[in-house]
């Protein structure tokens, strides 16, 4: 890999890192605002999606959606408004640890 290719590769990994930060920010914003229908749409929609909560484990996108939309509620659903009134959820994102793989294909 020459210097130009190495620099381009590094730039691509940095772009991926910023995209991940933006996705994490969207998750935090939408979930904190109880906009859980939109929040669920950010998930990968795969059979192996997995969400583990203190009250249960949800496997697959439909199960994850059920947890957030049906169990947590959504502020845009008139049936949920009274139950959500006065509730607040805060997600802090000040200790991020994001590792983009050297090949740029995965991250954790």
Predicted regions and their residues:
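Short, low-complexity N-terminal intrinsically disordered segments enriched in polar/charged residues
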Residues: 1-45
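A solvent-exposed, acidic/Ser-Thr-rich amphipathic alpha-helical stretch
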Residues: 36-108
């Amino acid at each position: 890999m020459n210097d130009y290719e190495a620099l381009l590769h590094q730039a691509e990994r940095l772009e991926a890192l910023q995209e991940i930060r933006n996705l994490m920010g969207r998750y935090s914003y939408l979930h904190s605002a109880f906009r859980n229908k939109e929040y669920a749409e950010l998930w990968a929609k795969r059979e192996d999606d997995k969400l583990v909560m203190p009250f249960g484990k949800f496997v697959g996108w439909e199960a994850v959606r059920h947890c957030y939309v049906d169990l947590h509620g959504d502020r845009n659903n008139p049936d949920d408004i009274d139950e959500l009134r006065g509730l607040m959820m805060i997600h802090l994102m000040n200790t991020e640890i994001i590792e983009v793989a050297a090949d740029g294909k995965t991250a954790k």
